[in-house]
């Protein structure tokens, strides 16, 4: 009941703010985009991998039957959002309420998107929860998931300043463009597995990114490069005697300052390289590589073998329904995390192996939020893995040395839109707890979607997903969904 009341208060506040803005004498004309969506999931055991992975932790994976109803309202920037400053100022807002219900759980209401954004020229300021992905990939829909920040966990509340996409570097005539972000976020209470002073602390997130684009819009080839850096921190003055106060700890996190034989906080991210090659006006190839860093091993290129790489073909031409088959996009990726800088970690000798991705020696929940991995879903938490494998206390994952081949594709057959995902992985465990033999796993998804003309623009979606292998419980699942979009 409290959740329902809170949901009504939040939505009511958003609507009141929106319509009060409309009532001002500035002739603001900002159409509200809405989406109404309802999905039903049914499976033979727990949900198959591709019915819950990269879904922002919105589909309960341990349930045989789940229904999810979504109400999405969005006001985006408009050129007339402020009459006197057409190109300088603007505002927008978004609220996305989701109602979850399964056979064994009570009704649950969550808000994965609830934020207000303000624009000042080429800069954007926003605060709240917002669905995002960080890291250069060929396609955010077909990807296996960006390594450090995919769409796998529930959005983290943040305040952020960023550029509105790529913006021109002055005096380069669009030859150089940059895209940058800087954010502070609030994590849940973090458990502590270090020392004996405290058991829990308040957790925070630091995040920054910087990407550079080389090449003018008219060029056939554009090059990309940059990084994303995340850090999980908090409680430094509580965990360690004479520890850093919060302000000093925050600055040490921002600059990656060495401290207490390591660094303040749990740091990770990727250094990314990419290239977009325009084959024609409506077709392109994207090549990308994410190089992983986690405690300094990339500095000496010890873990250079690890990373996510791939190629994406994109066909932007308008679907021709007179054709039987149209390929829209195809994405092929290879993820490797087996090196981790080698089997040796020696801080004095500056040998930074055993990166132990997504685990941490101070914060046992590792790189996770609300009990779900923030990064790639192919490094799973312990509870997702089959029970015969041993449970290790104070480790978020016992399988962070993986190799994955992933294929995603989408297109049209007549007026039916289709999408497939197929992923094969070899799972080695961790350096400290290796599996006796590599565990093989296959996960697949086939989805079809069609607009129903008799129902005024309602889309119907059906998907079938299945898991087969030794890492997850074998499962077969089906999803049925309806979606209505429009403006008012």
How would you label these PLM feature ranges?
Residues 162-347, 351, 405-407, 424-430, ...:
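Signature for the C-terminal beta-barrel architecture of outer-membrane proteins
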Residues 32-48, 89-99, 118, 125-131, ...:
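Transmembrane beta-barrel strands of outer-membrane/channel proteins
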Residues 25-34, 75-91, 119-126, 166-179, ...:
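Short loop/turn motifs that connect adjacent beta-strands in outer-membrane beta-barrel proteins
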Residues 341-429:
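C-terminal structural cap/anchor segments
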Residues 53-59, 96-101, 143-149, 192-198, ...:
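Extracellular loop and loop/strand-boundary signature of outer-membrane beta-barrel proteins
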Residues 158, 473-488:
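Outer-membrane beta-barrel "beta-signal"
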Residues 63-65, 99-109, 293-301, 398-402, ...:
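Solvent-exposed loop/turn segments connecting transmembrane beta-strands
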Residues 21-132, 141-142, 147-149, 153-166, ...:
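Beta-barrel outer-membrane channel/assembly domains of diderm bacteria
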